[in-house]
Amino acid sequence: MNRRIMSLAATAFVCLSPLAARAQQQVVAGGLAVQVAPRTYVVTEQGANLVLVADSAGVMVAGVQAPALVAKARRALAALHAGPVRYALLMDGPGAARYGDGGWGQRGAVALAQEELRGRIRHASRTPATPLVAGTRVPAMGYSEVVQVLMGREEAHCVKQPSGYSGADAAIHFEGAGVLYLNSFTMDGYPDIDVEAGGGLAGVAETAAAFVTNFAEAPQVIEPIIPARGQLATIGQLREFKDMLVAVYERVEQLVKDGKTVDQAVAARPTASFDARWGRGPVSPERFVRAAYASVVKDRQAEAARQGQGHSH
């Protein structure tokens, strides 16, 4: 079994403040957003989520900057009579490299992204075949492992996670609000995994396992958990997600060990027991199995290379 799946090493936040007073989750801004904590809102469009923190000091926006989601967020902020957006915390996901900074930079905000995502955005900006969405630009700042952003009464901790959706996975803990955003977590179905961009199934499972383990005794510190897609979640639902990922990885890994091709792995339906719950979202069971297969093959190749290097010394 892959040692990453066996260990599911904890890579999360080690020091977090107590939970702020929790506001009842309620629809606000004329139905454009849901308030999940004091001064903290979630905007949803086509299943994807964007986080808005509207403080007296300004606004912080976090998530994948899909144009339709950004447009809805702007309408919500106007309805909330919020101040100017000061920070845009960009997260990776399908299409993120072309979404640039979401257009927040030209409105005066400082946009920042994990350095791998920022690099792909920069590459897209220089490639005629994959231009950035009109009105967007390369984020002004990048970070490698962690960055902390203080704005008024809110402090956001952006922490690099194991490669999951891509090599630019990150988690954001909003300490003032006491909520967590995970870009590799999905509640509406199987997660996206871009293996070519450095992603891998084991990394998605590691991230989920780390938060489940580290906050099992204090779930209120990170709940509600805001996934990239789907409804707000509890730590129990994150645990269910993690258990599914580990089981699928183990099943696909065995198929690879048995010499099955990717098409044969798909035909074996290793996700069959999970499809009723997880197979109805935008990522089909077949697509998920193909990504899982590629992830396992890549992990086994990396492990073989490490062992080869060890024998050479």
Enumerate the language-model features and the residues they cover.
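N-terminal export leaders
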Residues: R3-S7
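Bacterial N-terminal signal peptides
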Residues: A9-P18
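Sec/Tat signal peptide C-region and signal peptidase I cleavage site
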Residues: L19-A23
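Metallo-beta-lactamase
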Residues: Q24, Q35, G58-M60, Q65-A68, L117-A247, ...
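Conserved beta-strand hairpin/beta-sheet module of binuclear metal-dependent hydrolase folds
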Residues: G31-L77, A170-F174, G178-S184
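Active-site HxH/HxHxD metal-binding segment of metal-dependent hydrolases
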Residues: A78-Q148
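Accessory terminal helices/loops
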Residues: A216-I222, Q231-H313
